[in-house]
Amino acid sequence: MKTELKKFGTTLISRQNGREAFAAYRPQLSTLGDNETLELDFEGVITFSTSWGDEFLSPLVKQYGSRLVLSHTENLSVKATIELLEKINQLPFNRNIPTENKS
C-alpha cells in the first residue's frame, strides 16, 4: 500500500496535526495485508517537523517495523526529522532510496 503524505499537506507540523492525520489514516491500515509493505511517499512535502512525525510515523514503525518503507526522503527537513526520530525511538526506518531510472 502506498500513501502520498502530501495529501495531508506540504507543511507537516505540530503534534496536534500529526495526531489528527494519524487518526484519519488509521482506518486505511485495516486493508493492509499481513505481508504487504506500507510505503509512505514524502514527495512534495516541504516541511516535516519532529512533533508531526512522532505522532504519525512512530506508531507505524513500532507496529510494522521493516514493512514500513519511506520513499522520497531526500528533502533536508524530512531527512533530519527521520534521523532524529530514529534516535528517539531507537528504531531504524526502512528508506527506499530511488535508483536512477535507466530507460
Feature names for model-found ranges:
Residues N17, W52-G53:
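Residues at alpha-helix caps and immediate loop-helix transition turns in enzyme cores, especially N-
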Residues M1-I46, P59-S103:
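STAS-like cytosolic regulatory interaction modules
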